[in-house]
Design a protein with these regions (language model features):
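Conserved catalytic alpha/beta core of Sir2/sirtuin-type deacylases, generalized to analogous enzyme cores
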Residues: 1-12, 19-37, 45-46, 146-249, ...
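Electropositive, gly/pro-rich neighborhoods at or near active sites that engage anionic ligands
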Residues: 42-216, 388-396
């Protein structure tokens, strides 16, 4: 692998969510400061649920998590600790709301460990949130980073661009993080028995195969099967990053909620098909509760099918070039059907990158090096041409 200044490293665009990619994201900052993380904003569980119910906004938890993963190593630990700090999971709601209001004061002890400029910016954004906090807001286990992002998003008229730009500079984020769409939607699934699930947090308890995956404006808890599917447009900023990508990666992570959900907005499949760069899938190793009953080959087929719903004229070779896996240490449902994957025109690339003593997890350093090496190899063999550059517009992400 060529050794480059990270500032000149390749633009790797990930469809991602959750925490599975956190380690690899962190490791990648040693090699490139130009990775782009298109994050799913559809989470409906935990403290995200309280924010979404109160303000009807996209979920910000996965965005917060990825910003922290890409933060420069020289950022004071006290800043990251505050960013990731949570209120207690138990306790009286009014007492916890009072605690939050007290933290809005410049004299509160929570700000003392932080550099003054960083403390000021964070306190201002907490103030934006407190100005709008409903009297019945449920603050249990609330993440401070989530509250700051929500406050900025609301202050800037529901525009992610200013608040993400500001906190990316504050944390010296070595990459780009943005939601795949700016819309308050929920993930839904029609199961094989005809039942319907609404809400990402329900996907960890799938009892039937998923027949159809879609987005909806309906909130979790709705039991009617008459749900209205919604296909929001891919943001123009995300589309431009895809257009100018040095590589596109469908990485490890919960199959439906972290990977496929990002492919549902209108325009994603077409943008991927048009991008002139390597396109790589890194499947999960070990058990993914969301992908029960799906072999590795079936996962590849489902990935392609969701992309082709938006780009029906695209063939497999327009959407996916290689599957990057570890046959020695990895554990893949149904095994590795080499010939079946190659019959689809997809190259199977074998690299040691799964932890030998823990097949559930990839070694972040080995996985990042394997990915970067594969991108270089595909370019060198002219498997796909290298993308050019593009100016990224400033717009409502």
């Amino acid at each position: 692998m060529s050794v480059l200044l990270p500032a000149l490293g390749p633009r790797l665009v990930f469809f991602t969510g959750g925490t599975a990619l956190r380690g690899l994201s962190r490791s990648l900052t040693r090699y490139t400061h130009n990775s782009v993380h298109l994050v799913t904003p559809f989470d409906s569980g935990g403290s995200s649920a309280a924010l979404r119910e109160a303000f009807a906004l996209p979920a910000v938890g996965d965005i917060r998590n990825r910003l922290a993963a890409l933060a420069d190593s020289m950022i004071p630990q006290s800043v990251l600790d505050f960013w990731e700090m949570r209120l207690p999971a138990e306790g009286d709601s009014e007492a916890l709301r009072a605690r939050l209001r007290a933290m809005g004061s410049a004299g509160h002890p929570c700000w003392r460990p932080l550099p003054s400029v960083m403390a000021d910016v964070m306190r201002v954004h907490l103030g934006y949130f407190l100005e709008r906090m409903p009297d019945d807001f449920r603050p249990q286990k609330a993440s401070m980073g989530n509250l700051l992002l929500a406050g900025g998003y609301l202050h800037f008229q529901r525009n992610f661009t200013p608040v993400l730009s500001l906190f990316s500079r504050l944390l010296q984020v070595r990459g780009v993080v943005l939601p795949i769409v700016n819309a308050c939607l929920h993930l839904a699934a029609e199961l094989a028995d005809g039942s319907v699930l609404v809400g990402q947090h329900h996907f960890c308890r799938l009892t039937q195969p998923v027949r159809r995956l879609y987005l909806t404006v309906h909130e979790p808890g709705r039991t009617s099967t008459a749900l209205t599917p919604c296909r929001p447009p891919l943001s123009a900023t995300a589309a431009t990053y895809l257009q100018s990508a040095g590589a596109i990666c469908y990485p490890m992570g919960s199959f439906y909620t972290s990977v496929l959900s990002n492919l549902l907005p209108d325009g994603v499949g077409r943008a991927v098909a048009a991008a002139r760069c390597p396109k790589i899938y890194i499947p999960n190793s070990g058990k993914d509760t969301e992908a029960q009953g799906l072999t590795l080959t079936a996962q590849v087929d489902m990935l392609l099918r969701h992309l082709q719903q938006d780009a029906p004229q695209a063939g497999p070779g327009d959407l996916l070039h290689a599957v990057l896996l570890d046959s020695r240490h990895g554990r893949y449902p149904g095994g590795i059907e080499w010939k079946e994957l190659e019959r689809r025109g997809i190259e199977v690339v074998d690299r040691e990158m799964v932890c030998p003593d823990d097949p559930q997890h990839h070694d972040p350093e080995r996985a990042s090096v394997a990915l970067l090496e594969l991108v270089e190899e595909l370019r060198a063999r002219e498997r796909v041409p290298e993308a050019g550059t593009a100016v990224i517009p400033e717009e409502d992400a």
